[in-house]
């Protein structure tokens, strides 16, 4: 069952919370302080924006910390305005028990650069209640992330 706006406000810890980001059946995550593009770490808060060049990907940290109960998971989709500009998002489930900021991957499939401003809404997360709490909620490598989390599979 998808959680409606009033249950999201009541049951999901989102910091910092923005009323503008709360949607009828989800929450719009915003561009956070760090990004990684073409091998470079970008201080988005300082620069005010991140630019994804044509045919390139970016890792972007969410502004929000999300903490999920053991019986709720998250499913994310790119906002349609960005999809209409040729931006594709590849996102994993947000497992029950997750706590931290999220590192998300966007790919600019267009022939034009795409600019995202610090604090701009870019991905919507919907929260889905499980039939019961997970026996083994997430406690993995990325738990508690507050900075960009790179793949544990290889060194950059």
Curated annotation (Swiss-Prot):
Q: Which cysteines are joined by disulfide bonds?
A: none
Q: Name one Pfam family in it.
A: DCD
The protein's matches in CDD domains, at most eight in alphabetical order, are given as: trimeric_dUTPase
Q: Which UniProt keywords apply?
A: Hydrolase, Nucleotide metabolism, Nucleotide-binding
* Residues annotated as binding dCTP: 79-84, 95, 124, 138
Q: What class of enzyme is it?
A: hydrolase
Q: Name one GO molecular function term.
A: nucleotide binding
Pathway note: Pyrimidine metabolism; dUMP biosynthesis; dUMP from dCTP (dUTP route): step 1/2
Question: Which biological process, per GO, is one annotated for this protein?
Answer: dUMP biosynthetic process
- EC number(s) on file: 3.5.4.13
Question: Known catalysed reaction(s)?
Answer: dCTP + H2O + H(+) = dUTP + NH4(+)
Q: Which family does it belong to?
A: Belongs to the dCTP deaminase family.
Cited function: Catalyzes the deamination of dCTP to dUTP.
What's the subunit arrangement here? Homotrimer.
Name of the protein described by the UniProt record? dCTP deaminase
Q: Which gene encodes it?
A: dcd
């Amino acid at each position: 069952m998808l959680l409606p706006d009033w249950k999201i406000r009541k049951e999901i810890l989102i910091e910092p919370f923005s009323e503008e980001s709360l949607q009828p059946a989800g929450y719009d995550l915003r561009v956070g302080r760090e990004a990684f593009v073409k091998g470079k770490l970008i201080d988005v808060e300082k620069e005010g924006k991140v630019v994804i060049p044509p045919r390139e990907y970016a890792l972007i940290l969410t502004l929000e910390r999300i903490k999920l109960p053991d019986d709720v998971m998250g499913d994310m989709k790119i906002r349609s305005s960005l999809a209409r500009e040729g931006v594709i998002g590849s996102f994993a489930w947000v497992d029950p028990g997750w706590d931290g900021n999220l590192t998300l991957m966007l790919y600019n499939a267009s022939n034009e650069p795409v600019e995202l401003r610090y604090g701009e809404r870019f991905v919507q997360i919907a929260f889905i209640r499980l039939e019961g709490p997970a026996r083994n909620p997430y406690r993995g490598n990325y738990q508690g992330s507050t900075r960009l989390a790179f793949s544990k599979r290889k060194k950059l």
